Amino acid sequence: MQVRHNIHPDHAKQFDTAGLRKEFLIENLFIANDITLTYSHIDRIIVGGVMPVEQTVVLSPELGKQVGVAYLLERRELGLINVGGAGVVTVSGQAYEIGNQEALYIGMGNQEVSFASTDAAHPAKFYLNCAPAHTTYPTRKVTQAEARPVTLGDNATGNRRTINKYLVPDVLPTCQLVMGLTRLEEGNMWNSMPCHTHERRMEVYFYFDMTENDTVFHFMGEPQETRHLLVHNEQAVLSPSWSIHCGVGTRRYTFIWGMVGENQVFDDMDHIAIRDIR
């Protein structure tokens, strides 16, 4: 499990490209028949990926030891969205079939969790966020049809997109974790512009649905001290509460957003006027 520390904005603005990428970019999320996890001290979120191919991948007790407990979900909840082929997640003996762009919420206290692919030729890719929890809520699958969609933006400004809210209070209860998926329409390249920050939550963006020759210029930093990261397919960016988070791609793409922090109010954000960005 990699560890990333919280960075003060006065420190972050001193980084060169390599320094920014080291602290905020997560590059290699999916490894065949393995689980990759990155622990961030920003609200103590864990970001990871699981790609079972011909083997079943299990959340081992060793992962719990790395966060000071007997098993990973002893004091944590977990949300995942599948961005690959069909798969099965088994939680405490109950199997959940999770198709492409379907989600699963796993409540605190589940000790036995395993991941498998339905077809090794088209393996599942489970992208996950895991956050501290204070109580147990029921484990539940969320399909695309059950998510709460909101379409925003305009073709003229290149930001026509549909925000699909999977793990939000309107769909199911969680302790603090909120997750969803935003899909840009063809010919649109901007996300979250005009941009915002949210003082009471951190956020992680996971970009996917891109060709190997495409990229997203992800903008970050304080509104008057912006920087950028070049992000490629199936890579994630940690966004502290003080940082803007928006991007423009060489063509359309999809991204998963996950938030943890003070509240679960999706619209609790501090909007930044485009003319005020530096």
Curated annotation (Swiss-Prot):
SUPFAM superfamilies linked to this entry: RmlC-like cupins (SSF51182)
Pathway assigned in UniProt: Glycan metabolism; pectin degradation; 2-dehydro-3-deoxy-D-gluconate from pectin: step 4/5
Keyword annotations from UniProtKB, A to Z: Isomerase, Metal-binding, Zinc
InterPro entries: KduI (IPR007045), KduI/IolB_isomerase (IPR021120), KduI_N (IPR027449), RmlC-like_jellyroll (IPR014710), RmlC_Cupin_sf (IPR011051)
Domain of life: Bacteria
Catalytic reactions of this protein: 5-dehydro-4-deoxy-D-glucuronate = 3-deoxy-D-glycero-2,5-hexodiulosonate
Alphabetized Pfam families for the sequence: KduI
Cofactor note: Binds 1 zinc ion per subunit.
CDD domains recorded: cupin_KduI_C (cd20491), cupin_KduI_N (cd20294)
Binding-site residues, Zn(2+): H196, H198, E203, H245
EC supergroup of this enzyme: isomerase
GO molecular function ontology, one term from the record: 4-deoxy-L-threo-5-hexosulose-uronate ketol-isomerase activity
EC number: 5.3.1.17
Family listed: Belongs to the KduI family.
NCBIfam families associated with the record: PRK00924.1
PANTHER family according to UniProt: 4-DEOXY-L-THREO-5-HEXOSULOSE-URONATE KETOL-ISOMERASE (PTHR38461:SF1)
Functional summary from the UniProt entry: Catalyzes the isomerization of 5-dehydro-4-deoxy-D-glucuronate to 3-deoxy-D-glycero-2,5-hexodiulosonate.
Protein's name according to its UniProt entry: 4-deoxy-L-threo-5-hexosulose-uronate ketol-isomerase
Biological source species: Tolumonas auensis (strain DSM 9187 / NBRC 110442 / TA 4)
Native organism taxonomy: Bacteria, Pseudomonadati, Pseudomonadota, Gammaproteobacteria, Aeromonadales
